[in-house]
Each structure stands twice: as structure tokens, then as C-alpha cells.
């Protein structure tokens, strides 16, 4: 870097021409200021190319997902519920009422429902009867369980329970129900329901319970008779149904005599006849397979000839 030199004039003591020369070591203050200014300019130039002072890159706008604005259009309109949604809102009672109404208006649909619906199970049928039984108990006034006042208060609920007993009993009888064990399971459960029917003080009101005993006794007799024809009498003995029937007859006060007679005649009930307290007949044929199984004689050698 070149430095500005300051010219100085020296005069000799003697008179003569003036001599001028330049002092290389003396610097003018003006020259010093100029050099500082150039240095500052150079620094500014250096800073202009520095990354810190470089112009910022243009920022890229952030793309945000645009919100779909739902505008009112023809899709927003009043319309009824679809069939699946409508069925979700119905209670069991409402659904049964609607289905029953449709079946009554269209007998062909009713027939298809009857043939397509699964058969009720014993547990399901007894559970429904328990529901009717609970309604009967809820309608009974406190402190008047067997009076005439209570009878007229629960007459409607009593009739509904008796109708349900009759309808379900027919469902579990042969030939609709081919399995003897299932028929006997239902009869055992429904007989317990009949035992719990009110014993009205007025004799004229007791015909409901007496009629129920007559019907269920006939049902027991039918199942036992059909079981003996198919060789199912052995199930009655081995399953303990004969003993249960005897207890039911005792609890009813001897009102299930028809079933007891069928048990004694068709199957061969072993023990005392609960009606006459005499030994019950062992069946029509003492040499039947059932009696041989009971007596332990089945499979024993059979003698042939006079000896």
C-alpha cells in the first residue's frame, strides 16, 4: 500500500536557493484519515460477501391442507331411517308386534316365519313362563294373596300364564318333539310352575289350577306312552323321571293320576302305586326287554325244550 509523503522545505543558513525533499517517515493526518476510510470501505466490501450478510433465501410458503367446507346442497334433506337403523330402535315387544302384524296381513310370510324359525329350547320356554309368572306376582296385592279381591286383580295375568303353559306344552309333545328326554325336561319344569299357582280361597276360582293339572297330567301320559312304543321307557327309569313324576303327583294332591297310570301300565313303574298303595304292575309284558333290564335278566341263557 502506497503511503502519501509530506514534502518539507528546509532552508540552509546560508542564503541560497531553497531545497525541497520529501520525508518518507512523516505521514500527513489527512492521509491517515483517507487510509482509514479506505480500510473501512474494504471491510464493508468483505462483509458484503460474507454469508452472514448475504441476502436471505426466499421463504417457501407452508402448504396447509385446505378444509372442506360443507355447503348446503341437495344431500341434506329430511328422509326416513333405513330398515336396519329403524330395527335398532325397536324394543323386543315392539319388534314382535310389528312382525306379528305383518304376518297377519300376509299369511304366506307368517308361514315362512313359522317354518324358518328355530324351535324353542326348554330353557327358553321356561324362561318365558317365568316372565309371565313374575307379572302375576307383581300384580298380586299385598296381604290378599288368595282372596277374591286378589283373584280379580290378577285374573288377566293368570289367564296369560295359563295360555302360555298350554301353548308351550303342546310344542314339546310328540310327534313334534321326538326326543323323550327333552319332553320330560320341559314337563318337569312346567309342572313346578303349576304347583306355584295360587290356591284361591273361593272354590269356584280353583278350576284354573285343577284344569292345568289335568292338562299336564295328560301330557306326561302321552310322552310316557310314546316312549314305550319306541323303546324309550328305559330313559324314564334311568333318568329318574318316574320318581320325579311320583313327587309331582304327591305335591298336587293326587291330581296327576293319569300320568301315574301310564307310567305303571306302559313302562312298568317299580314300587308302590301312589294312588292305591299297592304294588304297581310291572308292565304289559313281563318278558319285555325293559323289564329284563330292570330285573337283571337281560342276556341270560334261555331254556329250549321241556327240560
From Swiss-Prot:
It holds the Pfam family Cut8. It is found in: Cytoplasm; Nucleus. The keyword Transport applies. It comes from the Eukaryota. Residues 1-10 have a biased composition (Basic residues). Residues 48-61 have a biased composition (Low complexity). Its main location: cytoplasm. One of its GO terms (molecular function) is proteasome binding. Gene3D superfamilies: Tethering factor for nuclear proteasome Cut8/Sts1. Residues 15-34 have a biased composition (Polar residues). PANTHER family: FI02826P (PTHR28032:SF1). Binds the proteasome. This is Tethering factor for nuclear proteasome STS1. The gene is STS1.
